[in-house]
């Protein structure tokens, strides 16, 4: 029965219009892709990494075609088969009458419809598959780790290299079968193979055989999924123990359940085929079989493990989960390279400044006073010379040996900041052909200030004269090629066009100011970097890419021109090594006379069995993130290695990748994937370059944060969580919630033979503010070393936040700080350094002052120092030398230090510290009102100490206010009593904690 109503048809003009629009869209899309691919090929050719471009491109195309074609064939083949199996005769019914209209529409072009659906499905599947290029390359080129998982004895390499791609293939197979099943079901229904109305069998024999086969394949895939789930269980979170990896209930209940369900799935798949086609030939028993599978999955795979977890594990979780917590601890320490951390006890029992502070040559002289974040503004104002030069929001720390002395320097490069060009300077010609580069690496010793608090600059001069004593008169870190064409300030659109057609023509690029008269020199780029854009075809290509007609119209682009782009060092490394996670803080160094950017590269994975999984962005974010350091992507990982040290030449952009961790299987797999020679072996690292390697910041932050929990190796203690640590907040702004960044120092830690350049950080116990440990990362003989100095649990040594508050809340010091901040000047605090010394702890915190004048910059004016518990011995001095002298004097006046306490004793309180101005004569006794006032001061001091030890900051504030009031009352009483001399002060310093 056919309907008399014809189906609407589109007019010829409408079809032509749609065809033209689709054609234009496809043309422009292909043009954009083509231009991007061509320019990428040229760029990779410039940096000599075409193997990466071609390898990734070929892999993506291979996956796109293979998976897309397979998906199209599976879906399209089942659509064709369903149509091929349609019944020739269909009983008449209202349902079939309605479907007849659709059959009339589809039948004339049924092949076209099936092809269209297949192409669309294949296109989406291919696009999804091509993004899995990294998983495929690791699957093809991965090897063994040489370490087996603790449950199945399978090499870790299977989980890192094979399992991710197997899971993707399984997911793709599920998608293909489901789409084929839905498509076949629809075709069978439209063409009468399935009927919802009428009498007799509702499904033809052919349709039943077809659909039951697809269902059986789906169930067989589910069996494979159950098998893979057994391996995947070692990667999942264990709520019962708060660690990753299979726990007691997983191993003893869920693991056998998965195996049983896999067997049941195979049986059900066979039953579906047999009951649907060979025996009974209906859907009742296949339906019952599928229902039994569902019930089994709920009962065996859900209820049973839940019951074991609830009634067997939870009542004694500490004991039941101990074995699996131990697995997680061992795996996590291995995956994050924490197993080799050298943990030692540091008693820190000396609470009084030792006399050796004044004669030390390893720790005190190397205490860094310049904060690379604060003095960036100072560098810009004093070394900018022109308004468009910039040093960025944060400088870097490196070490150099000058005149036989090695120390750390604050370094920065004078880059072009295109955002600071004036309106006249920022036209296309000036922006891209004149202001093309910066000039010079500017450095200053990190422990020295001159001329009212300025850094003592020793390099990067532009020929200007500096006041004698305020800067070195000769370049102490000379660079034979100081020009900066590639730097951190470069963004996506900051390309430069260099080169001149006529060798006799005057240089067009602004080079640098010369002399005191404001004259300028110009320059022509002669480096090997850049893509040649002299031909018309190349100029047209980049005109399309940059959407800029001046590539074709401007005379500044000539036959000798080169285009420099992707000029950010970090982005260059990411582009040539897309398999690396790049550290967020590149730093410059002068290597063989050239300014070179050094960037740390990490290999990561997320499928290390039993290892803790972290979010890389969360674990590396602190106060400096997006303030001079790049923020990492939100990537979940549970394995990381600093496998590569990369360099980028600041002049010609040359990118070099050096192997640093020669034992990393992940790096070996990537190197193999790209021909085996992509990364230079470790033996080829130049000695001068390796001398500037530093422990990478992001890796250290990850290791530090993970170690705050996984330093606990006893499963029972780990489960209770009582010994966990935390990273303290920024000392001078604890309420901001930002974590204190680690800091680089050239210093000597306890047990070290000589000073090293190391990255250090303090950690505190959970929910407490005293110091728990110091962590240090450094290189010894070219190998990374992580060291931890753990303090006793009952230590009185304060943590960074507490120390800063104790120092700045000292009555005398607070008065001086208030004077510094008068006239709306800003008092800014530099890095608070925690330095183990003399079996105690020395704290150093530089104090900067920035006036309220326009274009003012921070100047180092004072240095806060503390020794011991953080509050008993505190000074605010003009410089480090004077501060150390005052600390030593306080220690001498306080008397000989008490012997270290035994393990079962509480460390004795130090003798109260007299103020530096207190004479050593015995004061006369106090009487009357003065004596009462003195007693109130003493009582306030006792309360202040108690509040400090309790860690209750609200109580501490009240006690501090009471001390101020008592001190003021005492001074007033002493002034009104002639017999009371200034020496008749109450015993005990009124400083916090004193």
From Swiss-Prot:
It is a multi-pass membrane protein. The chain crosses the membrane at residues 18-38, 61-81, 110-130, 174-194, 209-229, 260-280, 283-303. It is found in: Cell membrane. It comes from the Bacteria. Disulfide bonds: none annotated. Its main location: membrane. GO terms for cellular component: extracellular region; plasma membrane. Signal peptide: none annotated. The keyword Transmembrane helix applies. This is UPF0182 protein Strop_3729.
